[in-house]
Amino acid sequence: ATFDIQNNC
């Protein structure tokens, strides 16, 4: 499985 990492501030 692949995961997209996003940082939302």
Swiss-Prot record:
Keyword Disulfide bond in record: yes
One of the protein's GO biological processes: defense response
Alphabetical keyword list: Allergen, Disulfide bond, Pathogenesis-related protein, Plant defense
Domain of life: Eukaryota
Keyword Disulfide bond on entry: yes
Function statement: Basic thaumatin-like protein. Does not exhibit beta-1,3-glucanase activity with laminarin as substrate.
Further remark: On the 2D-gel the determined pI of this protein is: 9.5, its MW is: 22 kDa.
Family listed: Belongs to the thaumatin family.
Subunit structure: Monomer.
Protein name: Thaumatin-like protein 2
Lineage, top ranks: Eukaryota, Viridiplantae, Streptophyta, Embryophyta, Tracheophyta
